[in-house]
């Protein structure tokens, strides 16, 4: 007997072992589960983690961003509460929004534009639930706004909307989630500084929000307050945005493993060997083994299917991880490791997890966002403690000044 999950994935009633897998960073070695579960989670539509997850945080604690009931910055990881049912998390500038395994949505930190989604503009230093719904599946944070996909394939947004990044056809900020259109075929979403990229189940790519650097990929620099399609291709897979202080760019991997970038490029963050801005997607090299690309403040970090990590763009704080503070306009490899499982790119720093469930960090560290117990920048990866129980790093955190990661209890 068999059936289908939403999205067309085959459902098996007989258990199959999935292990080791990397659903979205979560290792499930030795866990009995349905086949395709990892792929389902990787698309952001699987609401439950494959293993129990504690949520840990560190870095800039302004406005309660670390969820500790205070505004203290921490240079070493601290746990957010005592729960072990966290599933997904994304960071904004000084805010955090997370999804639990029961599909509920929680938020804390800066709320000046309603980016916590709780109907107010009051900062929260501890997690508060956003509404009572239990169908949240995926989350992505921009500078002071968030977007989320529900299990029914609808897309929602809230927070700051000065460039139309909430996709409402206006520039009004919202302190509670509002639906973007009426479609139910959204698959993946990524957010940059003040813009959004989203892929539908048909593989088409859509963008909206700020566009002064061409970050929407529309061949122009016109802002859009409603979703507009990028070209006519149906082969887009994993979207991500990056940027800070009005310099934004975008990255997306296609289903064939090629990497494409566009937008601001003043420090080589597009990885195309120059510093020329591009308002339409351009391919980064000719390789077909890219897995994911992430953007930050004028820099990018990408992971390949062979487990290597590559970076490009700004590096004045060592965020390229190549042992220098020199900008690079073409991808450079971070060390020689081939065991990177997933990465997260913050404002000017990177967090990476290996297949051995160790956590590493590098780049800017002025408020302890590297989790190393100090505030010294690092230009090469340094291990965060000695634990081997990290099972997932954060998702979207392109504008964040703090960090989060998951541990197995």
Regions found by a protein language model. Give the residues of each.
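Surface loop/turn motifs at the tips and blade-to-blade linkers of beta-strand repeat domains
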Residues: 80-81, 130-131, 180-181, 230-231, ...
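Enriched but not universal
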Residues: 1-58, 397, 401-409
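Conserved core positions of repeat-based scaffolds
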Residues: 57, 95-98, 107, 145-148, ...
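Tandem repeat domain/solenoid detector
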Residues: 85-88, 101-104, 135-138, 151-154, ...
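Short glycine/serine- and acidic-residue-enriched loop/turn motifs that recur at repeat junctions
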Residues: 56-75, 108-125, 159-175, 209-225, ...
């Amino acid at each position: 007997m068999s059936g289908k999950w939403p999205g067309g994935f085959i459902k098996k009633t007989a258990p199959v072992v999935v292990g080791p897998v990397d659903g979205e960073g979560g290792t499930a070695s030795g866990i009995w589960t349905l086949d395709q579960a990892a792929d389902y989670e990787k698309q952001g539509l699987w609401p439950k983690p494959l293993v129990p997850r504690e949520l840990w945080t560190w870095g800039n604690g302004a406005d309660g961003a670390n969820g500790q009931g205070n505004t203290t910055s921490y240079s070493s990881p601290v746990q957010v509460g005592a729960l072990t049912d966290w599933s997904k998390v994304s960071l904004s500038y000084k805010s955090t929004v997370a999804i639990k395994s029961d599909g509920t949505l929680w938020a804390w930190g800066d709320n000046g534009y309603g980016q916590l989604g709780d109907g107010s503009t009051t900062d929260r230093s501890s997690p508060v639930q956003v509404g009572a719904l239990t169908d949240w599946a995926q989350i992505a944070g921009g500078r002071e706004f968030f977007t989320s996909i529900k299990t029914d394939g609808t897309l929602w947004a809230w927070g700051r909307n000065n460039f139309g990044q909430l996709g409402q056809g206006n520039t009004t900020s919202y302190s509670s989630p509002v639906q973007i259109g009426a479609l139910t075929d959204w698959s993946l979403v990524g957010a940059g500084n003040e813009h959004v990229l989203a892929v539908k189940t048909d593989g088409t790519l859509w963008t909206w929000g700020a566009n002064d650097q061409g970050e929407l990929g529309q061949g122009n620099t016109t802002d859009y307050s409603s979703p507009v399609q990028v070209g006519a291709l149906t082969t887009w897979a994993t979207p991500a945005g990056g940027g800070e202080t009005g310099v934004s760019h975008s990255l997306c991997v296609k289903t064939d493993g090629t990497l494409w970038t566009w937008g601001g490029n003043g420090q080589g963050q597009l990885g195309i060997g120059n510093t020329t801005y591009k308002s339409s997607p351009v391919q980064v090299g000719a390789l077909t083994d890219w897995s994911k690309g992430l953007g930050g403040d004028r820099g990018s970090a990408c992971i390949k299917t062979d487990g290597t990590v590559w970076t490009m763009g700004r590096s004045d704080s060592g965020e390229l991880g190549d042992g220098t503070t020199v900008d690079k306009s073409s991808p450079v490899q971070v060390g020689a490791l081939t065991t990177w499982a997933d990465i997260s790119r913050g404002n000017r720093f990177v967090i990476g997890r290996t297949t051995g469930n160790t956590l590493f960090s590098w780049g800017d560290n002025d408020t302890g966002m590297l989790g190393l117990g100090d505030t010294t920048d690092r230009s090469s990866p340094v291990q965060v403690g000695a634990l081997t129980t990290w099972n997932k790093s954060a998702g979207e955190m392109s504008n964040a000044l703090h960090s989060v990661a998951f541990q197995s209890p």
